Amino acid sequence: YGDCLSKIMSFAGYDVTREYYINDAGNQMYNLGVSIKERYKERCGLECELPENGYHGKEIIQLAESLYDTYGDSKLGEDIPFFKEAGLDILLEGIKKDSDKFRVNFDVFTSEQSLYDRGFVENTLNKLKNSGKCYISDDALWLRTTDLYDEKDRVLIKSDGNYTYLLPDIAYHSDKLNRGFDRLIDVLGSDHHGYINRLRSSLEMVGYDSSKLEIKILQMVRLLRNGEEVKLSKRTGKTITLNELIEDVGVNAARYFFASKSLDTQMDFDLDLAVKNSNENPIYYIEYANARISSILRGKEIPKDIKFSTIESDSAYTILNKLLEFEDVIISAASKGLPHLVANYLFELAGLFHSYYSVEKIVTDDEIYTKERIALINAVKVVINNAAYMLGLILREEM
């Protein structure tokens, strides 16, 4: 979603920075370090005692294996921070590698820990305390976010002295606004619905315009195989990684299927449909349209200054009208944050071309007739490929 939206916005003329926020601080990172160390001990032939709140997935075993390959058993005496940092480095390298494979590019990687190291979190805490909106209850420090948009007040510092996620998140968004961005778009998972109003309220309490922040909530994805849901659980180790999905269905299918659904729609990803070589599969249908046009245009000169004097059929006029819609679709998708508008437009345009191709000859002995239709289908190809670019698709020229 985020990569498609950034490409659409760039195409529409926005100056876009793609940023990845690394959650490398807090208890979950400590649990990661513990989990890796236990798996490393296991790899070294010692007893493994994974904590209940640790990570049980196969990727932790792979991380431990990687560390063993590098160090042997020489790191058995290291404390949790070593395994946390080593694991983070390997995971981040994998994220970058998988993102690149998925054609997702980031301009900036920002570390949560760096916000602590640079004093941003403490500065933010002091600003909030000075705002008069903080109070102590049950030995915890609370922020009175109900004074603005939130349904309940939020804890900043827990009774055990640990910071909640909210505090560094306020610092992070403050930092982005300090860098001069006019519009911030967060792309978050479906468990973050309550996050929107608490963050907006918090930003206003430290002096920022919260209307500059937009939070896009992605829905959970159900993977289907043979018509049945593939059950997944990160904690129990039953997962399908992005890399495995790409290997299974290909980058084009994965990207198109994800982009084609609106944010408020449950995403059912049919793994069988995604690899079908038939018109039932939308990415196949789109690629087939592009390949058909490419085959017709191959070796032909693209005419200019065409008047379309011989264009008379309803199917041709329908295509022309659809092409005229393209600019409005891009503007709407960019301004409203709706990449699925481009995905749906692309599918519809491909369908109109297939219909046109089935009822009207394109190449005939009539030179003017042929030139006008060559110009028409070339325009279709240009728009198909522009839309495909914005969705991160690389379409085949032959099938």
Where does each model-flagged region fall?
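Non-catalytic interaction-recognition regions
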Residues: 1-399
